[in-house]
Design a protein with these regions (language model features):
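Conformationally flexible catalytic loops at phosphate/diphosphate-handling active centers
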Residues: 83-162
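Short beta-strand segments
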Residues: 22-27, 60-62, 87-91, 223-224, ...
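Structural signature of the thiamine diphosphate
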Residues: 57-111, 259-276
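Redox- and metal-dependent alpha/beta enzyme cores, enriched for Fe-S-associated oxidoreductases
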Residues: 159-194, 199, 207-211
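Thiamine diphosphate
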Residues: 1-48, 58-79
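Short acidic loop-to-helix transition motifs that present clustered carboxylates
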Residues: 4-7, 201-209, 253
């Protein structure tokens, strides 16, 4: 995690040069030196562009060991497809977890021809990979081209998991470890007659706005391991038409079932009880 912070300038250069790179960030608590516990405090840094300039990373958020393996394979394909850095954003809990993983063969994905690489100029025009523009006009054209690419990514690469949302009156939104915890909360609440559902973003950027298009829930709770970052994207996704609340633990701590039930009871006037 600290290395990602130190390398933000380099990541900005990679985005400007449109180089396909895969970056892994196992997010631990901070700021500063921080601790080794689980955290999701790098959400803003990862999804909004941590370095200088109007750039974006494709950000994938696994919730278990198998997905850390699968999404890393996917990240290389997405990086090649879009000529863009891709970040796999896990957290300290996942990074220290031991689970069975099925080692899969890489899929034969049809990727664009690399007509930009500098592999020798025999019998063709020269190519140049650069992250700078010497005139304002060229710089603006580059910026507009990047934004068009980012819009294409938003249109085609949004990914999420939904769980028990078809009849849900209330929703939890959580990614990574929080998404994993939230699924057990949904099952426990359903056992007590509360129609709770889960949306687990898999791409944090592009944020899966499409997952919220037909949601008619009475309220939403975002579950995060930070001081409230993803909640901003959830509010934008529902156009602030649904009340969105927030619960978190920080510093490497994880939320308990009773604490989440207490928050749901408080915000939505429910009567959920642990252990029923």
């Amino acid at each position: 995690q600290r290395n990602e912070s130190l390398k933000q300038e380099g990541i900005s250069y990679l985005a400007a040069a449109e180089l396909p790179v895969v970056i892994i960030n196992v997010n631990r608590s901070g700021p500063g030196l921080g601790g080794l516990g689980a955290s999701q405090s790098d959400y803003f840094q990862s999804t909004k562009g941590g370095g200088h300039g109007d750039y974006r990373l494709i950000v994938l958020a696994p919730s278990k060991a198998q997905e850390m393996y699968d999404y890393t394979m996917l990240a290389f394909d997405l990086a090649d497809k879009h000529r863009n850095p891709v970040l796999v954003l896990a957290d300290g809990f996942l990074g220290q977890m031991m689970e069975p993983v099925e080692l899969k063969e890489a899929q034969n994905v049809q990727l664009p021809e690399k007509d930009w690489i500098t592999n020798g100029a025999k019998d063709r025009d020269k190519r140049k990979i650069a992250s700078y523009a010497l005139t304002n006009e060229v710089a603006e054209a580059s910026c507009l081209n990047w934004q068009k690419k980012y819009q294409d990514i938003k249109d085609t690469e949004q990914m999420w998991e939904d769980f028990q949302v078809e009849d849900a009156e209330y929703l939890i939104v959580g990614y990574g470890t929080c998404g994993r915890i939230a699924k057990s909360i949904v099952l426990a609440a359903r056992a007590q007659g509360v129609k709770l559902g889960l949306i687990r973003p898999i791409t944090l950027w592009p944020f899966p706005e499409k997952a919220f298009q037909n949601i008619i829930a009475k309220g939403i709770l975002t579950l995060e391991l930070n001081s409230g970052q993803m909640i901003e994207d959830v509010k934008l996704a529902v156009n602030c038409n649904i009340p969105v609340h927030f619960y978190s633990r920080q510093g490497g701590m994880l939320p308990t079932q009773q604490a989440i039930f207490d928050k749901l009871n408080l915000e939505f006037n429910l009567n959920l009880k642990e252990g029923l």
